[in-house]
């Protein structure tokens, strides 16, 4: 079971100055930056996935901060996706380089943003090893398996269109000599309809199926989908789970013969989760999660800046508290200060970033923040990690502040998660 990371142009400045919070002088975005697989050894994933919607704009495709520029798209197609992502060379020769359409980006549109020929040409030109047929997401999944006649026109349209696209995509792949391994995108409104679509795609010639629409589903529903799917398709047919948001529960799904799955969850949680920002193995076959220590930049954090503009906060006072909080944490890390004064210095600044709602809500939020902070400082997980990120930057990895720290923490999470998946596989053999 291979773990693929879905690329969102996540790279960091290897020479970033954490003391001044500045990039290296003359640093050029991308060219001087490094991806997780360049910063860490071993590589923190088994392959990469790139969504066409992140690379190529089209009518109806939602805009994104991680959208490739026109010049980046041209370079990717000219040099190939492996070279562009610097995921080339003998080390990555056998690693999956998978493409999909990024159907979330056009989910509100009547039809997919790209047709089968456009998608094929994108995969072939960029030299992907695997490519998913264009699909249209169906979000609902009813485990009661309602019949086709009970479904609305929109659901049936998306279901039938996804199958039609898969048929045309396979026809093109066959006529062009299969420059990559085609993967059939499977959608459905129930476990039974998903299984039936999968069987239809097997008959088209697909030997690798990519199961979509899983993101909003609960774990027990995904179990039902995979159980029904495996009861219908051939034993040798490979399964990929698209955008598997339940990555922390992957150990529950080893019995379904899953070949691969992709997820951004370990990296995204580094800066999007309220309390699970830093991963560590718990020694019992699972993972522990720690809250990062939030010390935002006083003159760049949106909430603090809003308070400054409204005259609620004094910028000089905020910066003094910010400086004290950072100094206290670094002194604690060096062993020259205890937990309690460190907590007080950080909370003295944190209270301003927590201001929202009424006094009672603020008070409850601050109590939770303090409890998470005390746990993180008591257990000092960054001191117990020997990954390349933690070994080099130390306590900076646990500070929730600036993209260069937060992404590094995400890289650490990818490495810990990849090792977690490998341990699960070893136990299941």
Q: Each predicted region: which residue ranges?
A:
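Short, solvent-exposed loop/turn segments at secondary-structure junctions
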Residues: 55-56, 103-105, 136-139, 189-191, ...
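C-terminal accessory extensions appended to soluble enzyme cores
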Residues: 275-429
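Non-catalytic, usually N-terminal nucleic-acid engagement modules in DNA/RNA processing proteins
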Residues: 1-174, 333-370, 429
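Glycine-rich phosphate/ribose-binding loops and adjacent secondary-structure elements
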Residues: 2, 176-344
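A generic structural signal for short, solvent-exposed coil/turn residues
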Residues: 89-91, 176, 233, 379
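Charged, low-complexity, helix-prone segments enriched in Lys/Glu/Asp/Gln
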Residues: 154-169, 193, 410-421
């Amino acid at each position: 079971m291979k773990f693929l990371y879905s690329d969102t142009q996540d790279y960091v400045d290897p020479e970033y100055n954490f003391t001044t919070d500045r990039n290296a002088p003359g640093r050029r975005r991308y060219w001087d930056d490094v991806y997780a697989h360049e910063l860490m050894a071993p590589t923190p994933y088994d392959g990469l996935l790139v969504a066409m919607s992140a690379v190529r704009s089209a009518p109806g495709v939602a805009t994104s901060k991680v959208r490739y520029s026109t010049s980046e798209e041209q370079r990717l197609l000219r040099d190939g996706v492996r070279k562009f992502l610097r995921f080339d060379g003998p080390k990555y020769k056998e690693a999956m380089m998978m493409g999909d359409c990024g159907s979330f980006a056009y989910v509100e549109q009547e039809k997919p943003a790209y047709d089968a020929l456009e998608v094929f040409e994108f995969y072939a030109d960029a030299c992907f090893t695997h490519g998913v047929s264009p699909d249209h997401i169906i979000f609902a999944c009813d485990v009661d398996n309602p019949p086709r006649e009970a479904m609305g026109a929109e659901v049936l349209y998306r279901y039938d269109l996804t199958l039609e696209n898969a048929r045309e995509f396979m026809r093109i792949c066959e006529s062009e000599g299969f420059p990559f391994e085609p993967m059939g995108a499977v959608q459905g409104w129930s476990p039974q309809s998903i299984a039936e679509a999968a069987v239809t795609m097997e008959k088209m010639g697909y030997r690798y199926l990519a199961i979509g629409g899983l993101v909003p589903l609960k774990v027990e529903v995904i179990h039902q989908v995979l159980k029904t799917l495996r009861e219908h398709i051939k034993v040798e047919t490979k399964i990929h789970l698209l955008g598997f948001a339940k990555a922390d529960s992957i150990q529950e799904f080893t019995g379904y013969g899953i070949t691969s799955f992709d997820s951004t969850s370990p990296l995204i949680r580094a800066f999007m989760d309220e309390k699970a920002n830093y991963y560590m193995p718990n020694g019992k076959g699972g993972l522990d999660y720690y809250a990062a220590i939030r010390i935002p930049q006083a003159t760049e954090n949106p909430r603090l800046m809003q308070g400054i503009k409204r005259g609620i906060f004094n910028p000089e006072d905020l910066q003094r508290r910010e400086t004290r909080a950072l100094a206290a944490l670094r002194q604690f890390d060096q062993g020259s200060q205890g937990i309690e004064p460190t907590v007080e210095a950080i909370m003295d600044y944190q209270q301003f970033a927590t201001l929202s709602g009424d006094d009672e809500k603020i008070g409850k939020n601050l109590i939770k923040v303090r409890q998470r902070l005390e746990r993180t400082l008591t257990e000092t997980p960054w001191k117990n990690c020997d990954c390349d990120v933690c070994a080099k930057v130390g306590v900076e990895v646990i500070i929730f502040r600036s993209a260069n720290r937060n992404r590094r923490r995400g890289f650490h999470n990818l490495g810990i998660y990849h090792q977690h998946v490998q341990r699960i596989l070893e136990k299941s053999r």
